Amino acid sequence: IIVPQLLNPDGSLQYSVRRYITIGKLIAREFTHGKDSSNNKEVSEYLCKDIDYNQTQEIDWAIGASFFMKREVYAELGGFDTDYFLYMEDEDMCLRSLKIGRPVIYYPKSKMIHNHLRASSKFGKKMFIHAHSMMTFFRKHGLSPQR
């Protein structure tokens, strides 16, 4: 799986690369109200603020705004897991890919504009869908997912 560098509509870098969610990172993310600008250590680690976003590198996963993969890799993975209606399907796909020896590569020479809205950070139906998808993810991969 290849993922491009994502930019905000104003051209600034979007923190689109992630480390796997854990209960600790989830709690920290909730306490910071999903703000990517937070200086919270757990949130910064989850958002991979410590990596060089100009360097091609293997990563855990990236938000699913744009994935590139060969058709045979998609088939080998069985496509997207239909247990996820919305949210977490990108993290699940990348983890399954890594588990079968197919790396996820962040490729910053390819750039895309992404208007990231974080609709699930507001209390409402999408937040409940996101919570349900997280429970599905933890049930399938454990509370501290590993490659």
What is each model feature region?
Residues I1-V17:
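Conserved donor NDP-sugar-binding/catalytic core segment of glycosyltransferases
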Residues P9, I23, H114-N115:
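Generic structural signal for helix capping and beta-alpha/helix-loop junctions
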Residues S16, L26, E30, E76-L77, ...:
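Residues that scaffold the ATP/ADP-binding catalytic core of kinase and kinase-like folds
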Residues V17-I23, K122-K125:
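Short, hinge-like loop/turn segments at secondary-structure boundaries
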Residues I21-I59:
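Short, flexible, basic/aromatic active-site loop/helix in glycosyltransferases
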Residues D52-N54, D60-G78, D83-K111:
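A short, conserved alpha-helix in the catalytic core of glycosyltransferases
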Residues E91-R147:
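Active-site-adjacent helix/loop segment of glycosyltransferases
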